[in-house]
């Protein structure tokens, strides 16, 4: 009977594979970033920074897994922020900031793409898409400065999706990192030249690792020209292990 069951499983799996699918045992970790974040954080009301909020996709995902999160969202693009205001301005405990975060305070040229999710402080590279519809000088603050101004002692989750600018965002949180006041970092890692001057993935990974963080998991990989294009990665400081 055991032999028959195994043979039947193999036949079914082979048939499914021929259709381009597979059957795998699901691990507890690494399947859904937001479920992993909820499990690690534990609190029902975490403090979250959503840097590169765009149209509020991450806000929506976080509110599905946390009953009452406090979310500080940052979106420097004018078109994207206007849309964000219309859809998310009345949500409780969500603060929308038309502001960029980087490594140091100042002003910097921002390239707004007609595809708002491709807007960046970096010019488009050979693997990027869309086109620049506007470029303007905008204010840049830092995670450290914002937390000081708003008396935020700790960040449970620092999420950054800023199209090649994520390393600068994390560098701007050096004070909190040194004080061990950030529990999780969730960011996009890019493998192709979507922007000019984008730092290589290993440089970002090394910087985060040097702050004492450890990788929880990579999540969905997206592909360009049959090569890895980008993915999201979650890091935890071992001080906050569950």
Segments and roles (model prediction):
Residues 1-242:
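Phosphate/nucleotide-binding beta-alpha loop and adjacent structural elements of enzyme active sites
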């Amino acid at each position: 009977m055991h032999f028959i069951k195994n043979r039947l499983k193999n036949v079914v799996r082979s048939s499914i594979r021929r259709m381009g699918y597979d059957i795998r045992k699901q691990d507890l970790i690494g399947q859904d970033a937001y479920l992993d974040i909820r499990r690690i954080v534990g609190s029902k009301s975490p403090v979250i920074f959503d840097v590169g909020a765009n149209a509020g996709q991450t806000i929506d995902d976080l509110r599905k897994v946390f009953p009452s999160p406090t979310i500080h969202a940052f979106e420097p693009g004018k078109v994207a922020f206007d849309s964000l205001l219309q859809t998310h301005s009345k949500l409780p405990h969500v603060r929308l900031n038309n502001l960029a975060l980087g490594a140091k305070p100042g002003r910097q040229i921002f390239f707004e793409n007609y595809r708002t999710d491709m807007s960046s402080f970096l010019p488009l590279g050979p693997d990027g898409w869309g086109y620049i519809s506007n470029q303007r000088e905008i204010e840049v603050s830092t995670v450290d400065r914002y937390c000081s101004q708003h008396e935020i002692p700790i960040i449970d989750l620092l999420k950054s999706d800023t199209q090649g600018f994520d390393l600068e965002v994390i560098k701007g949180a050096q004070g909190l990192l040194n004080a061990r006041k950030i529990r999780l970092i969730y960011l996009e890692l890019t493998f192709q030249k979507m922007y000019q001057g984008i730092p290589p993935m290993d440089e970002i990974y090394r910087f985060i690792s040097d702050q004492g963080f450890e990788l929880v998991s990579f999540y969905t990989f997206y592909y360009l020209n049959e090569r890895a294009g980008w993915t999201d990665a979650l890091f935890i400081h071992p001080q906050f292990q569950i």
